[in-house]
Amino acid sequence: MNAVTETVDLQAPPSPLIFTDSAAAKVKDLLAEEGNPELKLRVFVQGGGCSGFQYGFTFDEAVNEDDTVLDKNGVQLLVDPMSFQYLVGAEIDYKEDLEGAQFVIRNPNASTTCGCGSSFSV
């Protein structure tokens, strides 16, 4: 009799979108300044920019039925389905350096990016 052993990896699959602690902390600070606990950060992709697509950020109170919602340290990040397809595997971060402070999206799907960092193509 032959025994077959199968190994199953029970770890959760990687998140399709990474929302860093640094980004969540900055959003939490901005929300405190706004004084509206119902606000969430919405990230989106739209046509435009010098490379074809550009990223956008806005605060939104409404969560649409088809939104992807990520919770991080009490902050919600919203992404609509059209934008999500361009952001799968991306990291949304906040950085402060000599060039200034800004939200940054590191997107493995972008084949080219603009020098400004807010425009890309796939």
Curated annotation (Swiss-Prot):
One of its GO terms (biological process) is iron-sulfur cluster assembly. Binds 1 iron-sulfur cluster per subunit. Gene3D superfamilies: HesB-like domain. GO terms for molecular function: 2 iron, 2 sulfur cluster binding; 4 iron, 4 sulfur cluster binding; iron ion binding. Iron-sulfur cluster binds at residues 50, 114, 116. Keywords: Iron, Iron-sulfur, Metal-binding. SUPFAM superfamilies: HesB-like domain. InterPro entries: FeS_biogenesis, FeS_cluster_insertion, FeS_cluster_insertion_CS, FeS_cluster_insertion_RrpA, HesB-like_dom_sf. Its cofactor is iron-sulfur cluster. Belongs to the HesB/IscA family. Required for insertion of 4Fe-4S clusters. NCBIfam families: iron-sulfur cluster assembly accessory protein (TIGR00049), PRK13623.1 (NF010147). Homodimer. This is Putative iron-sulfur cluster insertion protein ErpA. The lineage of its organism: Bacteria, Pseudomonadati, Pseudomonadota, Betaproteobacteria, Burkholderiales.
